[in-house]
């Protein structure tokens, strides 16, 4: 490959989306939950997806990862169409997923979790322990004895050791104390700064704004809002009405 071609490809990777969704219709069996949804995320960006409970946010992630039914549309990672791929194939292609229920195994230690799905790359167990120092002291602890915050850190760490190019996180701050939430948000920002594209479902709008380069809102499976964090702040009342969730003040130390 010539130097010019290699350079051109690097430039394209910077400017082209890392992940794209085109006119997705998806749901469970014959039931359609997501309708005509499209968006794109570039490398090193975070997209926050907001909306009230039951509007299809989790179903969206389940469809992207192959756990729910895709009726039509396209799921593209880099230059590859992953729409027909299996859940395993999508993970191998670089799609990481932290589900809402965390899926931590009670009978495995922290260290054993970080061997699951491990692939060569920047993110290994040592890098995860550096990102989450609290886990380093719990290497031999079973999943059953971890706190909710520790389980969430471990779920993120387990996804990271697969060295995905795109990470999906479904409400990672749910049910956690403000102190733990602040630490998680700082960790997610570091992940984004390392060049990963992150898709974040978040019920708390202040958290969504604190992390996002871009925000979208969905209602009844359809896109009802799209804008950056500054626009979302400026249109606070309008977006609150759309998503049915109150927008609280964003802490200054968590904003860009």
Language-model-derived ranges and their functions:
Residues 167-171:
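Catalytic Walker B motif of ABC-type/P-loop ATPase nucleotide-binding domains
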Residues 69, 81-102, 125, 137-141, ...:
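ABC ATPase NBD coupling module
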Residues 73-81, 93, 121-123, 127-130, ...:
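Conserved ABC transporter NBD signature motif
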